[in-house]
C-alpha cells in the first residue's frame, strides 16, 4: 500500500461531498502538506480538516480548472513555492450540466488533462522531481453510459482513456509517476439529479 506519511498532496477538487470526505481521510494518513484547489473557498471545511491533524499544513487556492494552459503554468509556479514538491496529485474537479456541453467537457476532461500536463513536469524524475502518484477521479458512468447524462458520460470515458494511456509502464519507467483512475459510484445528490432529469425527459 502507498504510504502517505510525510507526503505533499495536491487535491484539485470540486465543492462536493466526495472531495471533503476524501480530504478527511487524507488528514488521517500523516501527510505533511495538503493543497486544496477548488472554485469556492470553504473556511468551515478547512477548519474541520485542520482539527483532524493540526500538524499537517493546509493551503487553499481558488482554482479555475478551465483556465488556459499558460495561465495554469504560472498558477502552479506559485503553488510550488508553498508546496516545495508534489508527491500526489488528485484530479477531482467535476461538472454535470447537460445544457452546457462545453463547460462539462472543459471541466471534466480538458481541464484535468491540462492540470496533469502542467503538474507532471514538477513530479517527473527526469526533470528533478521525486516521482509520485496521479489519481484521476472519474465515474462508473465512464464505464457504463447513462442515457440522461450523455456529455457527462462522454467526459468520464475520456478521463479513463487518458488515464489508461498515461498509466503505461513505459511512462512510469521514465518519470517515476504512477497514474490511476478511481471510478466513483453514485452519490445521493447525483442519483436525485439523475432521477429528476429522467422524469423530465420522459
UniProtKB/Swiss-Prot annotation:
The active site is at residue 152. It holds the Pfam family adh_short. The keyword Oxidoreductase applies. Keywords: Oxidoreductase. One of its GO terms (molecular function) is oxidoreductase activity. NAD(+) binds at residues 11-34. The keyword ATP-binding does not apply. Substrate binds at residue 139. GO terms for cellular component: cytoplasm. Belongs to the short-chain dehydrogenases/reductases (SDR) family. PANTHER family: 15-HYDROXYPROSTAGLANDIN DEHYDROGENASE [NAD(+)] (PTHR44229), ALCOHOL DEHYDROGENASE-RELATED (PTHR44229:SF8). This is Alcohol dehydrogenase-related 31 kDa protein. It comes from Drosophila erecta. The gene is Adhr.
Amino acid at each position: 500500500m502507498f504510504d502517505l506519511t510525510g507526503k505533499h498532496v495536491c487535491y484539485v477538487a470540486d465543492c462536493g461531498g466526495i472531495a471533503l470526505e476524501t480530504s478527511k481521510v487524507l488528514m488521517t494518513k500523516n501527510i505533511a502538506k495538503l493543497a486544496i484547489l477548488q472554485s469556492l473557498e470553504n473556511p468551515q471545511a478547512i477548519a474541520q480538516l485542520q482539527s483532524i491533524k493540526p500538524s499537517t499544513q493546509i493551503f487553499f487556492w481558488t482554482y479555475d480548472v478551465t483556465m488556459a494552459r499558460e495561465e495554469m503554468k504560472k498558477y502552479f509556479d506559485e503553488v510550488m513555492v508553498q508546496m516545495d514538491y508534489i508527491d500526489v496529485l488528485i484530479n477531482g474537479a467535476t461538472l454535470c450540466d447537460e445544457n452546457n456541453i462545453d463547460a462539462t467537457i472543459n471541466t471534466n476532461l480538458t481541464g484535468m488533462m491540462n492540470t496533469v500536463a502542467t503538474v507532471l513536469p514538477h513530479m517527473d524524475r527526469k526533470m528533478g522531481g521525486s516521482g509520485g502518484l496521479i489519481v484521476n477521479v472519474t465515474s462508473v458512468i465512464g464505464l457504463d453510459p447513462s442515457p440522461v447524462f450523455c456529455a457527462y458520460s462522454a467526459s468520464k470515458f475520456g478521463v479513463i482513456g487518458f488515464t489508461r494511456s498515461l498509466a503505461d509502464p513505459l511512462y512510469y519507467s521514465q518519470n517515476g509517476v504512477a497514474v490511476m483512475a478511481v471510478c466513483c459510484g453514485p452519490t445521493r445528490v447525483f442519483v436525485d439529479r439523475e432521477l429528476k432529469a429522467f422524469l423530465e425527459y420522459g
